[in-house]
């Protein structure tokens, strides 16, 4: 299988790259990034691109599956508009190009409670992206909605707080369906869904079931 990764420098993306490198069924890994992550492996081809200039890289989008796990915060992006551009526009445009290039499968990391009709900016944006991706002519589309993530060496204080709160409630028997999830569990689930060509929307309980095998 020839894999394409969008978001290889993020927490899930880093685990995904390693998962694919260690998998003997994966022949090639093409990553599309804005900066060089310094990955030195014979399977990996790094494309350093400007996502606003797709005419320069669109023909390089060749493979069997796209793994899309781009994600940022409003603080990191600098504004709502920039966050939308990174989280929605870049991912949708890449997916559209992949479909045009004949890539048959697309695996998207969305977010828990994503809903295009949500009154909240983040979950609405993620829901809108899901709906847009579903309209593209892929043979298989897998959408993952992970809960709060446990990232290695995270510096996001809000994320640390949300994980701590969820872990507290989990300890007293509440919100079990939203217990925090390690990024490597998400990465493993993504690979398994690509291999089995399972389409659908996968909620936290589904991701745990598949990703912890």
Residue ranges and their predicted role:
Residues 2-23:
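N-terminal Rossmann NAD(P)H-binding glycine-rich loop of SDR-like oxidoreductase domains
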Residues 4, 38, 44-93, 97-100:
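NAD(P)H-binding glycine-rich loop region in Rossmannoid oxidoreductase-like domains
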Residues 6, 32, 69-70, 106-112, ...:
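SDR active-site strand-loop-helix element
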Residues 22, 27, 116-213:
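Oxidoreductase cofactor-interface core, primarily capturing Rossmann-like NAD(P)-dependent enzymes
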Residues 30-38:
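Short, polar loop motifs at secondary-structure junctions
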Residues 80, 85-130, 135, 142-144:
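Conserved Rossmann-fold NAD(P)-dependent oxidoreductase catalytic core, especially the SDR/UDP-sugar
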């Amino acid at each position: 299988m020839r894999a394409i990764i969008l978001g290889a420098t993020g927490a899930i993306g880093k685990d995904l790259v390693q998962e694919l490198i260690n998998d003997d069924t994966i022949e090639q890994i093409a990553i599309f990034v804005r900066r060089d992550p310094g990955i030195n492996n014979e399977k990996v081809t790094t494309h350093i691109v400007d996502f606003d200039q797709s005419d320069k890289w669109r023909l390089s989008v060749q493979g069997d599956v796209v793994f899309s796990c781009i994600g940022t915060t409003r603080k990191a992006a600098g504004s709502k508009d920039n966050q939308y551009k990174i989280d929605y526009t870049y991912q949708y445009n890449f997916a559209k190009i992949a479909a045009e290039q004949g890539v048959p499968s697309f695996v998207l990391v969305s977010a828990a409670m994503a809903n295009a009709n949500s009154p909240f900016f983040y979950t609405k944006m993620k829901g809108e992206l899901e709906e847009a991706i579903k309209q593209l002519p892929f043979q298989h589309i897998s959408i993952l909605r992970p809960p709060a993530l446990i990232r290695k060496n995270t510096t996001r204080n809000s994320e640390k707080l949300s994980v701590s709160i969820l872990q507290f409630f989990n300890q007293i028997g509440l919100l079990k369906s939203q217990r925090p999830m390690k990024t490597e569990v998400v990465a493993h689930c993504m690979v398994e869904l690509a291999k089995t060509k399972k389409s659908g929307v996968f909620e936290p309980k589904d991701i745990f079931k598949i990703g912890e095998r």
